[in-house]
Every structure is written in structure tokens, then in C-alpha cells.
Amino acid sequence: MRGILGPVSAALTLAEALEVVRANPSRSAILLDVDGTLAPIVRHADDAHVPEVTRTHLIAVSRRYALVACVSGRRAATARRMVSIGSIAYVGNHGGEILPPGGTVPEVDPEFARAGERVRAFRDKVLDEELHRLRVRAEDKDQIAAFHWRGAPDEEAAEAAVRRIAERAEAEGLVVHWGRKVLEVRPTVQVDKGRGVRRLLREADVDAAVYVGDDTTDLDAFRGLRALVEEGRLGTAVCVGVRSDETPPELEQEADLLVDGPAGVRSMLEALL
């Protein structure tokens, strides 16, 4: 683990790590990934949901802190449906769009929106009978195409097919990104959770921020917050990794603090109150 502003002691408690934001909630932001963080990972992504007790804690946190937002690889509108709290912000498609609190139409990065046509055309081209037979699920996220193999009858064969898709995507000049049993094909326009978080905080009057996530895409958010600290635009960043059987080693290395699964995130939300 890294330190918040230097090395973190292994004995550092959750309450101690969060004291910097608990002491000044009106100047603090709480940012959380959704899948694997607020919502447990499930066999089929469409079945994922945020447990009611977690949602209740998140509502209480949103009433206490200056800014609370969910930062997701899903569309912003999909993330809001999952979380079902309209009074917080949502960063969707890995930073490509932002749905402000109470908003109904996400603000999509114009260049990102234009570039999505190539990804949609690629997705339509690679969908074939083999993917259907292997039960690889293709997800259309407008500007991003995702291919999930979690829960396939033969996950090894399904992953091999998805890796062939990745090779084709790279050959066509598209960007590939791997997550927890999912491949994302993205346009060449650079979007990531770090850029999304920076964009979100640009208008926020906060001195400290906590980010909580479980996957490789969340590392971009960690780095984005730390860059803001280095630039003097944010006083403190606390990066919390959510541990699971599939935790990327880089996440454990870069996190200031680790919690165990969505249940650990729930405890963290309680500690913020």
C-alpha cells in the first residue's frame, strides 16, 4: 500500500485514514466505483444491484459531504438506475460522460461522442455465432463496446474468443482495456476515470477527496486524484482499494487503504458518518 501523503502504517485504522474528510465534510468529496464496490459482482452484469443497506448509508453520506459521486464504466444513466439515488453525481463510461445531481441528460464529451461510431461498427462486425455459442455477452455502451465472459459455460474458451476480438480491435486502431472478466473496446479518444474525476472536481469547492474502487480502471482515478494533489488543486487524496479474489496486484500496491469487498465498503460508509 502507498501512503495518503507518504507511507501508511499497516496499523492505520479505517477511522484514522478517513479522519481528514470526516473533520471537514463541507469541503470533502466521496467518490465510489459501482460494480464490485457498492454492488457485489454477480454472474450476469445485468443482475447486479446495490444492496438496500448500502444505499441507505450512501444517502446519509450524500447529505453530509460536499460532493458524492459514483464513477462507473457503465453508462451514467445505467449507474444511476443501479444506485437509485438522484441527488448525487454520476460519471459514466469511464469518464466520457457526467450526469450532475438531479440531471436527466448526461453531459458527453463531444469528441468522445463523435468517435463512438467506429466502435459501434466494430461491435456489429465481430458479433457472430461463435460468441453466441460460447455465451459471451456483448454490451453496447454507446461509445464503448464491452464483451463479458463471466458465467460462460466454458470460461476458458470464451476468454480465448474475447482475446481474438481484442487483437482485431487493436489491428483496427481501437483501444482495448481489460477488467474483471470483461474486455472493453474504446475509441482512440482518451477517456478514463482519472480524467472523469478531474473534470468532476474542476467545479467542486473541496480540499480533500476519497476514491473507492476495485479494478484496474480505478487506478486511473487514484492517479488522477494524486495528480490534483501534486498540482496544488487538492489538499489530500485518500485512495481505497476494494479487495476480492480477483484484486489486481497493482490496486493493492497503489491503494492507501484496503477494505474487504462491498461489505467493507459498507463499513467504510458507516465510518464516514
Enumerate the language-model features and the residues they cover.
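A short, Lys/Arg-enriched amphipathic alpha-helix followed by its capping loop at the start of a domain
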Residues: V20-N24, S28-I30, H57-Y65, L225
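Mg2+-dependent phosphoryl-transfer enzymes with acidic/Ser/Thr/Gly-rich catalytic loops
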Residues: R2-L14, P25, G194-L273
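Glycine-rich phosphate-binding "P-loop"
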Residues: L38-A48, R180-V189
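The start of beta-strands in P-loop NTPase/AAA+ ATPase cores
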Residues: S28-I30, I88, A209
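Non-catalytic pre-domain segments flanking phosphatase-related domains
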Residues: M1-V34, L38-V42, D46, V53, ...
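Conserved acidic, metal-coordinating active-site core of Asp-based
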Residues: R133-G235
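Short, structured coil segments at secondary-structure junctions
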Residues: V83-S87, E172, G235, Q253-A255
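Active-site phosphate-binding/coordination module
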Residues: H49-K141
